[in-house]
Amino acid sequence: METEIAFMEVIHPQQIEELLSVSKSLFGSNYHEYHYFKCTTNELIITARFKSKFVGFLKIIFEKGNSVKIDCIGVSKNFQRKGIASNLLYHYFQNHHSQTNGIYALAWKTSSGIHAKKLFQKFEMKGVKNLGQIWKNKCNIDFQCPYKSNRCNCEAILFKRDSI
């Protein structure tokens, strides 16, 4: 499968609507809203397209103190396990990451395992701390979680790679 990885600031309403559709299918309703995909000067969104359709995205936030947060990475279910998430991160590290910056991300831990664990490990990020159920008070209130049964059962695992 040939995937075009495009670095762009998403500004067209149609593009944002497509990215919201990807987000909703993965993370549930209202997890991301329209303004989430409108980048500020300290944010970067890298998108993956296949045949002119958005199939994935990576959002990076450049924080103070040489710290970078992988805020979210999402790939449409039909396109998962095809290297798209790896290519999004590879594109970021090759074109935008400074070795003086540390980088971190939160991964969901559900009964089926830690989502994105292998992906983050591929980029030398280590699971350093279980932060517990940090989404518990927002789950099915601020957004409709696709993993929630009777109660929130997701935990946040902090993955981190220090600067060199």
Question: What spans do the regions from the language model cover?
Answer:
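Short loop/turn motifs at secondary-structure junctions and domain boundaries
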Residues: Y36-N42
